[in-house]
């Protein structure tokens, strides 16, 4: 996807046609409300509460990994935005829309929180993430590829944190 964005390839042109067809296809108030789920002021308190819950239940390492995963979001998203310098759907003069930081924030915060509290909440976290990304596209804040790239990035961030958490649990069990 990144390569297609950089060279303005056929996938990017399809992305632009899809965006033009769906922007403002739902009431703006609804798409704005959905996209706001990716704001730090909404997503970060959810993750912080789940981290506090995990610490309270003796899972400090898991809470640490969730916090580090969230810290990784801007460390990865901002350089990609700078590198690709992709203009926005409604603001062709502005740059830095690829990948979507709101989508990555929502995914890492909500899925991370779900893993910390109860794995049964992961489907709800996935729905919140999907609603966020859909709202961003329908409102015209992001292209669909911006959102898809952030989902891929979120899987990488969460996967790296998950591997670290699993290995720390295995180490604790074998040493105990």
Q: What spans do the regions from the language model cover?
A:
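Transmembrane alpha-helix boundary/anchor motif
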Residues: 1, 9, 13, 71-79, ...
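Hydrophobic alpha-helical topogenic segments used for membrane insertion/localization
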Residues: 1-2, 48-49, 127
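N-terminal transmembrane-helix/juxtamembrane module of multi-pass inner/ER membrane proteins
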Residues: 1-42, 81-89
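Membrane-helix interfacial "entry" motifs
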Residues: 24-32, 54, 58, 62, ...
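Membrane helix-loop-helix hairpins that form the core translocation module of multi-pass transporters
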Residues: 26-29, 72-75, 148, 152
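Membrane-interface loops
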Residues: 45-47, 53-120
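Membrane-embedded catalytic cores of phosphoryl/pyrophosphoryl-handling enzymes
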Residues: 89-176
